[in-house]
Amino acid sequence: MLSNPSTDIGKKELDIYLRELGKEYRKLAGKKSPAEIVLIGGGAILANYNFRTSTTDVDAIIHAASAMKEAINRVGDKYYLANRWLNEDFVRTVSYSPKIEEFSQFYRQYSNVLQVRTIKAEYIIAMKLRAGRKYKNDFSDIIGVLMEHEEKNEHISYGDIDRAVINLYGSWNAITEEAKTFLKDVLSCKDLAERYAELRGSEGEMGLL
């Protein structure tokens, strides 16, 4: 009997799947066909932070030979993952900007052909502000990113975020007033861990956990 498709991808699993993807892609496309994947959203957060334990799918920007599609499917079949566990649907959302890749950073390389990159912290925050979805985890993700950087004494300032918003979207015009107010509030918060727990609790009541 076939297993039900897995709907949650954790940090450890993400690395396993990307490693397998590198192997499968190399088998199909050869060692002279390099590929690049830029992890966006939940995937970027899983790769770089510990506050988020899982994501239901991995949003990415993919530059690769046509064999990548088959490689993705093979990994999905091997690990009983949901269809489109790794996809480019993000490019059709409001938070997408063609400039995002300019502000990505190296994460890991697999099988000497697949380079995986992620998005810098302030750009993750900028995209979450642009999305501003209450039915997702956008606001709690912002706090989580700020919180973990504070714990490492790597302060993210309003200026850093402002620069990211301008670089991606040209101005703050597309950011809602609610999102702007939220950002100012959390940047002045003295206990981000407590604020994060409170917001996650309210998201849990809405069925977002």
Locate predicted features.
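Compositionally biased terminal segments of proteins
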Residues: 1-209
